[in-house]
């Protein structure tokens, strides 16, 4: 039985930034990439093409990693000026995210470290390096670590709760693997339904965010 979080880093970003538009999309269970493409291109969601959605997806996840206009241009195979316009349009639609990212970098420079919602820290001496490229790297880490690190903290909580629930229930099914935002249980077929419910509940309720944590669960004979 395999369960993975749906867009957990973007959900963490929505929660931490409190951006109204992104929070609204997740609360209404909308496809965030389609919604982003529609808003950035100024069209209704039903008019979004697969290419538009793919570009929006690259920006959504790229923002989490502090992507530059040069990086986005490379990833999408478009001119740098187009990538720059796309990012500017993105931040216009999600102003809370732009302000939040700037705040993350500012706080990291002030404190010397970035931290997750649960208080896990990464110290960033790179931010005071005399070398520009190293300082830029430090800024990207300052943007990304609180988001990706919080997502990592959440799945660790889910792992502990799932393990404890299986032990407490006396199940023979075992939690055997974690891969990024995904948990895998080697389950007896006679316990399948119970295990699906336990895994879903433990993952969805691992941490309370301003938007729902969504989990996709699949069962198969092999991984």
Region locations from a protein language model:
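Conserved catalytic core of nucleotide polymerization and phosphodiester-bond processing enzymes
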Residues: 1-223
